[in-house]
């Protein structure tokens, strides 16, 4: 019986100058996705993917490393300028933005897109430790 060849999707080298860096910073993790202006993903990374586990994922240093890795992925496609959208209340917001600048990307704009409820769902009860 002949085995069917498995086709894998090859990464295309896009030549993109401008893009958007989406930083989602929660209390437990930081996820950085860099897309082109249409929304197609060029590169992404998270604190967990970089190698941090447990409570270390929520640190600013983990966010810095994740942003660095995502920027390196995106710069292989020729990315130079980036607009930053930040979502969430986590500790890695500023560290991730600084890391994008240090990696060699020019930050044009920083926008906070944290969703704020107009008195929607009831929040979880307060923790008593």
Curated annotation (Swiss-Prot):
InterPro entries: Ribosomal_uS11, Ribosomal_uS11_bac-type, Ribosomal_uS11_CS, Ribosomal_uS11_sf. This is Small ribosomal subunit protein uS11. GO terms for molecular function: rRNA binding; structural constituent of ribosome. PROSITE patterns: RIBOSOMAL_S11. It comes from the Bacteria. The gene is rpsK. HAMAP family: Ribosomal_uS11 (MF_01310). One of its GO terms (biological process) is translation. The keyword Ubl conjugation does not apply. Belongs to the universal ribosomal protein uS11 family. Keywords: Ribonucleoprotein, Ribosomal protein, RNA-binding, rRNA-binding. GO terms for cellular component: ribonucleoprotein complex; ribosome. PANTHER family: 40S RIBOSOMAL PROTEIN S14/30S RIBOSOMAL PROTEIN S11. Part of the 30S ribosomal subunit. Interacts with proteins S7 and S18. Binds to IF-3. The keyword Ribosomal protein applies. Located on the platform of the 30S subunit, it bridges several disparate RNA helices of the 16S rRNA. Forms part of the Shine-Dalgarno cleft in the 70S ribosome.
